[in-house]
Amino acid sequence: VDGVVNKKISYGTKNMLHEKAMTYEQAKEAVQVGIDCVKELSEKGYKIIVTGEMGIGNTTTSSAVASVLLDRKAEDVTGRGAGLTSGALERKIEVIKKSIELHKPDKNDIFDVISKVGGYDIAALTGAFIGGAMYGAAMVIDGFISSVAALCAEKLCPKCSDFMIASHVSKESCTADILKILGKKAPINADMCLGEGTGGMVMLTALDTALCVYNEMSTFDDINVESYKELK
């Protein structure tokens, strides 16, 4: 498919309920993929990059990673994803709890966390955010999964959040908390339950509008209007 870059590491992750999602080395390799992709885009002249992901079930792994990094209970960081029933949500929370209990990921080792209860999407996005800092590209945070990856990147590479721009607050419960930790405030709050770069693309439109206003809107001097004067 034109435009798709094949960086496959393996055919999916393992079932984290029974074994580690991937090996430690595979997690590192996936992070490097993200860094390399941003390097390639930067060399082509791109200055701003929208992150995003595509998948089913990856809010489960993202909630697991968030639970570990934020040191919060699974039920406090887990939402309905694409629209789970209450029963399915309970099952999702239970899977996350059991997976964390089984693998005991070390929150001080991001590669350990991702390899045990994460996914390749989270790992590659983590690398992309780090790549943004390395190569001077502004990185737009999309939804919940993207924000979890941004948090992983900040843990691995402190201050890389200086190159991040928040787009929207996902409906998933702890997205706002993650953005706050990153020092970001998302201007869009639309209760969106999807990632896939959707909110990020809307944010690009908002940025275009802001730049247009800043660069092209008439000033008081342009239209011969006196500046405000302090009333005494």
Regions found by a protein language model. Give the residues of each.
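N-terminal loops that bind phosphate or other acidic moieties
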Residues: V1-K232
